[in-house]
Regions:
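The feature captures the catalytic groove of carbohydrate-active enzymes
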Residues: 367-389, 441-503, 514-584, 759
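Non-catalytic carbohydrate-binding regions of carbohydrate-active enzymes
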Residues: 486-520, 581-610, 629-749, 753-754
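Aromatic-residue-lined binding/catalytic grooves and analogous aromatic/hydrophobic interfacial grooves
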Residues: 30-458, 556, 578-648, 690, ...
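Alpha-helical packing segments of well-folded alpha/beta enzyme cores
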Residues: 309, 341-344, 348, 395, ...
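Bacterial Sec-dependent N-terminal signal peptides
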Residues: 1-30
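Short, charged/polar micro-motifs that form catalytic or ligand-binding hotspots
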Residues: 21, 47, 331, 335, ...
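Well-ordered alpha-helical scaffold segments within catalytic/enzyme domains
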Residues: 326, 347-352, 398-410, 483-496, ...
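Aromatic- and histidine-enriched alpha-helix N-cap/loop-to-helix transition segments
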Residues: 339-340, 390-395, 407, 475-483, ...
């Protein structure tokens, strides 16, 4: 009997051992899924720099629990004041009695990515925060096993007028050159019907009027789009079981505020709070009426709101993803981190899916008190560096290009239609200043289509061209609009959308270069073109770096690619008149320029230039974004030489902020270099929420840092040329990955790579399987010779 028992114990031990061995092996082989990437915090936060993002539709929140109280800042797309500061809508503080969050043990805060909400749990009390994707409403739902009293306070630092002095003006369009005293005017805040109503209403006169006068556009002012005059934004905080409970004053971080409290009529186990937001440019009576109508409509029509919002987020995550892990690893190592941060940053982009205005590169909807970025900047939570209504094109493009391969075409409309709305104002610039056609867009662009007034420069020579920025960085940098033209064209190329509404815009941008550089040439001499019949693109600019450039390669690449893509449209999509014009224009575009380093031919920044002013690498723009050079395309070696031997390209190389070296390396098939720079780019930030990078060159969270990182990872996994889809053009064999990305011709590509082997290959439509070329572990020479 004893022998049998010992034998049984021995067998059981071995069975358990084998089970654990298999379990360990199985665990090692697993690639993370979305749920694994949910940020989960087991302790409360010290301040808003340790907050968690939340949002939906066009609303963003920073959520944190501090000293037992729940706080959140909330922001919305398009809330620009008179000076073009992107104002937050306020801060909410939630206190519970008795307080379930008073203890250190048992706290849990989680961002549930799949369903798009934040959950906070402790002592049998759960708070769920979520934002309606389809209507501008913030929800807070409390569920407790015991009755609690809730006090929800709307806190505003704009309870009074505030002077804006010195560096505080970097948050608005005046920057370092304010014209007179700049005042952030107070909001209107009051209790109404057991709720709190709050709004900011712009005056009639704004920075728009100042800029129009500065830039001598007054003759056409009445024709121009003015998005700021009388703009009114705010909302109403309310709940079924709440009553007004007085005001209080306080100071949070460096800023005094006034609080307006709502409290539970009676303690309850279930309580809900809603913040309804509304923005419009109509009169204040209409604004009030429309807000009230929106609230009453929501009571009857909003019953499916939570289900619809969850469904939207579920579809969002199913549309595209990149899940990563090192081979045979279960640790949250550097490769795991870049997969998590890819998802977290894409979530942040999804929070402004349908904003009237694009997601801002310098913080998006998730900025907090500036002292946590720079202790010398003790300004209000409205502060961000590089302005609110100023859209800097070279930064903005990196926020929106990742949406192409992630298939988020619906989310790109905010950025593309933003430009479309400014076409008239940009064309008026050409007509007023130079009496020719075309849309004249600049790099640092106000939300009304004129150059930023500080960058335009107030202290100018009297006879200086009023159409020009008097600015060493930005002068003659007109070509950055073409990357948004590229995105417009990609809506058709990738998603098959009808893009005819963009045709006149794109052609107008091309026409500006055609007519303006002939105009400049005729002012220098008798001929409008060079001896080969080409435009003389002088003075020009290679990004902000190569100044007073002659025939910058970044400009030439843009003109060549955009014109060619337009001419690929069918006769139904492009008129004969436009087609004939583009064919003629195509003959006037000059060729690219080259130079040599130690006998190696490389792409040049331009034919010539007078000085170097910044640290971009536009000599590699023919690689990205323009795709003239790359894997499967002619003369890849010249582009590789540019990476390897161009001394400026080497000197400027970095992963910080808007730097694109991770993208260039991926496009060139340089697996080791792409891995290095993407690990640096997409590794954890030094903040509690790992995708709050920055400030880099801009602000926190740096969205062009995250956007360029997303692009780099996508390009490591999937590229296209000549109708072929290249898998793993720069992906290390030792990194497991499960990804789903979008390609041209309405194609989705889903692949799972485990231990260097393809486990899943799902292509829709299936007929595109014939176009797949697997480049995993291919040598540099094999990639160069690929046709």
């Amino acid at each position: 009997m004893m022998r049998k028992l010992l034998k049984y114990i021995f067998l059981m031990k071995n069975t358990i051992l084998i089970f654990f061995l298999f379990a360990t092996l199985f665990a090692k082989a697993q690639i993370p899924v979305l749920e694994n990437y949910n940020p989960i915090w087991k302790t409360q936060s010290n301040n808003p720099s340790e907050s968690m993002p939340l949002g939906g539709g066009d609303i963003g929140l920073n959520v944190w629990v501090e000293k037992g109280d729940l706080y959140f800042y909330f922001s919305r797309s398009g809330t620009f004041d008179e000076h073009n500061t992107l104002l937050k809508l306020g801060r909410v503080k939630v206190s519970l009695t008795p307080n379930p969050f008073k203890d250190k043990e048992g706290f849990r805060q989680e961002l549930v990515l799949e369903d798009g909400y934040v959950s906070i749990i402790q002592n049998n009390t759960k708070i769920k925060l979520w934002v309606d994707v389809f209507k501008p409403v913030i929800h807070l739902d409390l569920d407790s096993k015991t009755t609690v009293k809730m006090t929800a306070s709307y806190e505003s630092w704009r309870h009074k007028n505030r002077d804006s002095k010195g560096k505080a003006n970097n948050a608005n369009s005046y920057k370092w050159a304010p014209q007179g005293e700049i005042v952030t005017f107070k909001d209107s805040i009051a209790f109404e019907n057991d709720g709190v109503q709050f709004y900011h209403r712009n005056r009639q006169e704004t920075v728009f009027d100042v800029t129009v006068k500065q830039q001598k556009m007054e003759s056409v002012k009445d024709q121009m789009l003015n998005p700021l005059a009388n703009l009114t934004f705010g909302g109403f905080m309310t709940g079924d079981n709440f009553k007004s409970d007085g005001t209080y004053s306080g100071k949070y971080q460096d800023t005094d505020f006034k609080g307006f409290s709502l409290s539970s009529v009676k303690p309850s186990k279930k309580q809900s709070l809603e913040l309804h937001l509304y923005t419009n440019q109509n009169d204040i009576n209409s604004w009030n009426t429309n807000l009230k109508n929106q609230i009453s409509d929501y009571k009857t029509k909003g019953k499916q709101a939570e289900k619809n919002t969850i469904k939207w987020w579920n579809n969002f995550w199913n549309r595209s993803f990149i899940y990563t892990q090192k081979n045979q690893s279960t640790a949250k190592d550097s490769v795991y981190q870049i997969g998590q941060n890819y998802q977290l940053f894409r979530y942040m982009l999804g929070c402004n899916a349908y904003g009237k205005y694009p997601t801002k590169f310098n913080g998006g909807l998730f900025t907090v008190d500036p002292v946590f970025t720079n202790p010398d900047l003790n300004f209000t939570p409205d502060f961000r560096n590089w302005g609110g209504g100023t859209m800097t094109a070279q930064n903005q493009r990196l926020v929106y290009f990742p949406m192409v391969k992630s298939g988020d075409f619906d989310m790109m409309k905010s950025q593309l239609d933003y430009y479309l709305g400014l076409q008239k104002n940009a064309e008026l610039r050409s007509q007023v200043y130079w009496k020719h056609g075309g849309a004249a867009f600049t790099e640092q662009l106000e939300n009304f289509g004129l150059p930023n007034p500080a960058e335009y420069e107030w202290k100018r020579p009297a006879d200086y061209d009023p159409g020009m920025e008097y600015n060493a960085w930005l002068e003659y940098e007109w070509d950055t609009v073409f990357e948004f033209c590229q995105m417009m064209l990609q809506q058709k190329e990738f998603a098959g959308e009808d893009i005819q509404k963009y045709n006149s815009f794109i052609i107008s941008c091309l026409r500006f270069f055609d007519e303006h550089y002939q105009y400049l040439a005729k002012h220098r001499g008798r001929k409008a073109l060079d001896g080969n019949g080409h435009l003389i693109l002088y003075p020009g600019s290679g990004a902000e770096t190569y100044k007073m450039a002659n025939n910058a390669n970044s400009t030439i690449s843009a003109l060549q690619v955009i014109t060619k893509q337009l001419l690929n449209l069918s006769s139904k999509e492009l008129s004969k008149e436009d087609s004939n014009y583009l064919k003629g224009f195509q003959t006037r575009i000059p060729p690219l320029n080259f130079r040599t380093f130690d006998g190696h031919t490389t792409l040049a920044p331009a034919k010539s230039w007078e000085r170097i002013n910044n640290s971009e690498v536009p000599q590699l723009y023919p690689v990205y974004p323009w795709g003239i050079y790359g894997i499967g395309k002619p003369d890849l070696e010249t582009a590789l030489n540019t990476w390897k031997y161009d001394t400026d390209a080497i000197k400027f190389r970095s992963h910080v902020g808007w730097k694109q070296d991770n993208i260039f390396a991926a496009r060139l098939g340089l697996t080791n270099e792409a891995a290095k720079y993407n690990l640096l780019k997409m590794g954890n930030s030094d903040r509690r929420f790992p995708a709050f990078w920055g400030p880099g060159f801009d602000w926190v969270p740096d969205h062009n840092w995250g956007g360029s990182g997303m692009i780099g990872m996508q390009e490591m996994l999937l590229q296209e040329s000549n109708g072929k889809i290249h898998l793993f053009p720069a992906w290390p064999k030792g990194w497991d990955v499960h990804f789903k990305l979008h390609a041209t011709q309405n194609t989705t590509v889903e692949v799972e790579l485990v231990n260097g082997e393809l486990k899943v290959l799902k292509i829709i439509p299936e007929e595109r399987k014939k176009d797949i070329i697997n480049l995993l572990n291919k040598s540099a020479e094999e990639k160069i010779n690929l046709k």
